[in-house]
Curated annotation (Swiss-Prot):
InterPro entries: Ribosomal_Su5_D2-typ_SF, UDP-acyl_GlcNac_deAcase, UDP-acyl_GlcNac_deAcase_C, UDP-acyl_N-AcGlcN_deAcase_N. GO terms for biological process: lipid A biosynthetic process. The keyword DNA damage does not apply. Pathway: Glycolipid biosynthesis; lipid IV(A) biosynthesis; lipid IV(A) from (3R)-3-hydroxytetradecanoyl-[acyl-carrier-protein] and UDP-N-acetyl-alpha-D-glucosamine: step 2/6. GO terms for cellular component: membrane. PANTHER family: UDP-3-O-ACYL-N-ACETYLGLUCOSAMINE DEACETYLASE 1, MITOCHONDRIAL-RELATED (PTHR33694:SF1). It comes from Leptospira interrogans serogroup Icterohaemorrhagiae serovar Lai (strain 56601). The active site is at H264. Keywords: Hydrolase, Lipid A biosynthesis, Lipid biosynthesis, Lipid metabolism, Metal-binding, Zinc. GO terms for molecular function: metal ion binding; UDP-3-O-acyl-N-acetylglucosamine deacetylase activity. This is UDP-3-O-acyl-N-acetylglucosamine deacetylase.
Length: 301
């Protein structure tokens, strides 16, 4: 029997402080509880400037190097690591107040966000979230890059990265996942980059907050970092990005993801493809017959 999922928020307000990857400047992020049905909403507050941007597919304005949400005037960059933690906790309703245009990079993974949000406590609402179960294959392709979604009653990912580097040539992983496994096996994986690219970006005034404290940095033939959290940490981080991006659909999308050299653009394209078919014959929703017959109140979990 498939798991019944309910809308969730946090119990208490929690504050998170870090630096922006590109600006190198301090960022203050405050997560607030929100009523059921609110969704995940970023509230930008900087002096007299204010903006409210929901984490929705229609608000994705850029997928180059990171995922950016915007309203046509304001933007919030690098949302995927935070949203991956939100996804793993099953949170559906949050106000995320931020005083900068990019989410803090923290240690380059989702772990600090996970720990902060968990420390605030989780409350579960009586309203049900309906996962989407794929009945026929879906795919998005860009040259030699692809992301395929196959029918499966469990969440599963097969991911391959293939960089021109001896340690990242054909690095691959297949994992079956649930919320707890995502927390333990995916969210601690840090972002990665190549030393030559970091130096070029910093020469242009970008990646000013990048360091060995918040990224895996690869030299021509090895790692600058002394220790990895996983032997295949880089490909695991790509799965982290995938979940952060797919979460913007607003409902869990269950299936077997097959990815090769994919990234934010294909992740978002897949989420849009799924949601465009959500009322069609290709998609099976979580049917109402699985809703309990008794009335359920909000509970702390």
């Amino acid at each position: 029997m498939k798991e019944i999922l309910y809308r969730r928020s946090i119990q208490d307000t929690v504050r998170i402080k870090g630096i922006g990857l590109h600006s190198g400047k301090e960022v203050n992020l405050t997560a607030h509880p929100a009523p059921s049905g609110t969704g995940i909403v970023f509230e930008y507050r900087k002096g007299l400037e204010k903006a409210s941007i929901s984490a929705e597919l229609s608000n994705v304005v850029d997928t180059s190097n990171a995922t950016t949400l915007g309203d046509g005037i304001h933007k919030i960059q690098t949302v995927e690591h935070l949203l991956a933690a939100v996804y793993a906790l099953g949170l559906t309703d949050l106000i995320l107040e931020i005083d900068a245009v990019e989410v803090p990079i923290m240690d380059g993974s989702s772990l600090p966000f996970l720990q902060a949000l968990e420390s605030a406590g989780i409350i579960e609402y009586p309203e049900i979230v309906e996962p989407i179960y794929i009945q026929s294959p879906l795919w998005v392709v860009d040259g030699d890059k692809y992301l395929v979604l196959l029918p499966s009653d469990e969440l599963k990912v097969t991911y391959t990265i293939d960089f021109n580097h001896p340690l990242l040539k054909g690095q691959s992983i297949t994992v079956s996942l649930d919320r707890e496994k995502i927390k333990q096996e995916i969210l601690p994986a840090r972002t990665f980059g190549f030393l030559k690219d970091v130096e070029a970006l910093q020469a242009r005034g970008l990646a000013m907050g990048g360091s060995l404290d918040n990224a895996i940095v690869l030299t021509q033939d090895g790692y600058l970092n002394q220790q990895l959290r996983f032997e295949n940490e880089c490909v695991r981080h790509k799965i982290l990005d995938l979940f952060g991006d797919i979460s913007i659909a607003g409902r869990p999308i269950i299936g077997h993801y097959l990815a090769s050299k994919a990234g934010h653009a294909l992740d978002i394209s897949m989420a849009k493809l799924v949601m465009s078919n959500v009322t069609g014959d290709e998609i099976s929703k979580y049917k109402s017959r699985r809703i309990p017959l008794f009335k359920r109140k909000a509970v702390v979990v």
